């Protein structure tokens, strides 16, 4: 009797009652324990379905091929050859299956890539369609406004330059190339920058009023000249701009008639230039002599003027020194060339939000703008897209300050300061890593020093000084507080060896140092 599984003569034969097949008892029992099925037909089969077959006890003669040692060796050789051929065939089949599986995986990966690209193109098409609708609406509105203006016989004349280009005009490619090259240069040099003469925290704790400057009005905005920190620009609520020299301890000049309304922000620019922004919606650029001395400051003359339609709340100087960005309550952000006196482009008009503060990133590739609803918006200079929003403040964003190393952004409303990590902006909706709340205080100004290690927060009745270390958690820790009312606060650059504040109750500017 031949076993249906092994194909050899059985020693203990059994018969399946369901199929009549003969099996070796030990083999079929193992198969049933493992699979529970008939080997040839796949039908359910149990041990009770097997019947033992009784055979005679006569000794079976050996086959003729196994009667001698040479014959047995030949038999073993044939069996070995068959085994090797079967193994080789199995290896070939395994390799074929592996290649087919790899090919299927590559096809699956390619299909996923195609799907991702199509989804991206779909989203871009939707965004382009939405932008096109906004542009068409703006053009229709502008056409209606032009028709109304043509019907009006009175023409308003102004010496200030009002932007005429629409928001969809991109920044000139030549200008953007300069900005990109400067950004790459700054990224390389920033890693090599050291601050050997930087004031230590213990020294800053000892800061006190070392000098004060009396003026004929309250000073709303301050700026320390980064090229010569002996010079301090002051913007008054009477519309005048003052320049003070620490070296001579006197006012170099008072540039009167700069504005007819309070100066909201004043900046130093290269080539002995001062830029001021007022509540009268006008930005003024004035320039003196070739060197910043008392003699040349008295020779300041108005060079250019730029106009918004409502109060200019803030301005920021680009790291190149040739361009500024301005924020206004007329729901626009304008970029100007202060060297040639031209309006370059506008941002954020489609957002329909009043902008209360603005600041360029130290690398100069994008800027942040604070809004009246407590949101800080990031705009890319090249694409002009609002690429990210920082949230968490409840009222208008009064002031913004970037750390010079480019890692952090601080923004403040009336009594809360938020510290955001720009490196995590792509991974979180609002990557704020620390919140500072000043109860019973109204925050007026915040300012990072040049080393990015100190942060000053000035409020209506206190100056709060903090250290900032990226390796500690939280990164900002308080090091000192000074009881003093403030309207503005600025660190000296680059060594942070003093800072200046303006009083909210007196016509005075205080200089704090050791």
UniProtKB/Swiss-Prot annotation:
Domain of life: Eukaryota
Record's compositionally biased regions (Low complexity): 137-166
SUPFAM superfamilies to which the protein is assigned, alphabetical: RING/U-box, WD40 repeat-like
KW DNA repair (keyword) present: yes
Gene name, Swiss-Prot/TrEMBL: prp19
Pathway stated in the Swiss-Prot or TrEMBL entry: Protein modification; protein ubiquitination
Keywords, in A-Z order: DNA damage, DNA repair, mRNA processing, mRNA splicing, Nucleus, Repeat, Spliceosome, Transferase, Ubl conjugation pathway, WD repeat
Family note: Belongs to the WD repeat PRP19 family.
Official protein name in the record: Pre-mRNA-processing factor 19
Single GO MF annotation: ubiquitin protein ligase activity
Assembly and oligomerization: Homotetramer. Component of the NTC complex (or PRP19-associated complex) which is associated with the spliceosome.
EC number: 2.3.2.27
């Amino acid at each position: 009797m031949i076993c249906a599984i092994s194909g050899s003569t059985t020693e203990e034969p059994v018969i399946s009652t369901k199929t009549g097949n003969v099996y070796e008892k030990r083999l079929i029992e193992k198969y049933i324990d493992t699979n529970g099925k008939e080997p040839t037909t796949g039908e359910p089969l149990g041990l009770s379905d097997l019947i033992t077959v009784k055979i005679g006890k006569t000794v079976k003669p050996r086959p003729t091929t196994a009667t001698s040692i040479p014959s047995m060796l030949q038999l073993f050789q044939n069996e070995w050859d068959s085994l090797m051929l079967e193994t080789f065939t199995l290896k070939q089949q395994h390799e074929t299956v592996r290649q087919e599986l790899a090919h299927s995986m590559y096809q699956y990966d390619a299909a996923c890539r195609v799907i991702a690209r199509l989804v991206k193109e779909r989203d871009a098409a939707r965004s382009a369609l939405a932008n096109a609708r906004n542009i068409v609406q703006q053009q229709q509105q502008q056409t209606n406004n032009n028709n109304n203006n043509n019907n009006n016989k009175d023409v308003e004349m102004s010496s200030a330059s009002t932007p005429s280009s629409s928001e969809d005009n991109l920044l000139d490619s030549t200008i953007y190339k300069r900005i990109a090259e400067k950004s790459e240069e700054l990224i390389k040099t920033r890693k090599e920058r050291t601050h050997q003469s930087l004031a230590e925290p213990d020294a800053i704790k000892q800061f006190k009023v070392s000098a004060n400057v009396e003026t004929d009005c309250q000073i709303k905005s301050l700026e320390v000249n980064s090229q010569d920190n002996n010079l301090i620009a002051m913007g008054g609520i009477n519309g005048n701009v003052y320049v003070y020299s620490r070296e001579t301890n006197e006012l170099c000049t008072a540039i009167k008639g700069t504005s007819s309304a309070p100066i909201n922000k004043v900046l130093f620019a290269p080539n002995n230039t001062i830029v001021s922004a007022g509540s009268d919606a006008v930005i003024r650029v004035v320039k003196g002599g070739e060197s910043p001395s008392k003699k040349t400051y008295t020779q300041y003359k108005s060079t250019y003027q730029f106009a918004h339609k409502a109060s200019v709340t803030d301005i920021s100087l680009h790291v190149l020194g040739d361009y500024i960005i301005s924020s206004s309550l007329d729901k626009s952000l304008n970029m100007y060339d202060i060297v040639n006196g031209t309006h370059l482009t506008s941002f954020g008009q489609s957002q329909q939000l009043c902008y209360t503060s603005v600041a360029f990133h130290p690398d100069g590739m994008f800027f942040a703008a604070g809004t009246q609803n407590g949101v800080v918006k990031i705009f890319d200079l090249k694409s002009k897209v609002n690429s990210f929003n920082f949230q968490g403040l409840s009222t208008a964003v009064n002031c913004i300050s970037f750390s010079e190393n480019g890692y952090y952004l601080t923004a403040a409303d009336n009594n809360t300061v938020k510290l955001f990590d720009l490196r995590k902006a792509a991974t979180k909706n609002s990557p704020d890593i620390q919140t500072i709340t000043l109860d019973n205080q109204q925050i007026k100004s915040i300012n990072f020093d040049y080393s990015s290690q100190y942060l000053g927060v000035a409020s209506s009745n206190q100056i709060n000084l903090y250290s900032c270390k990226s390796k500690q958690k939280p990164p900002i820790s308080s090091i000192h507080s000074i009881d003093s009312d403030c309207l503005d606060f600025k660190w000296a650059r680059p060594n942070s060896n003093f800072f200046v504040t303006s009083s909210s109750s007196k016509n005075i500017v205080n200089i704090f140092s050791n």
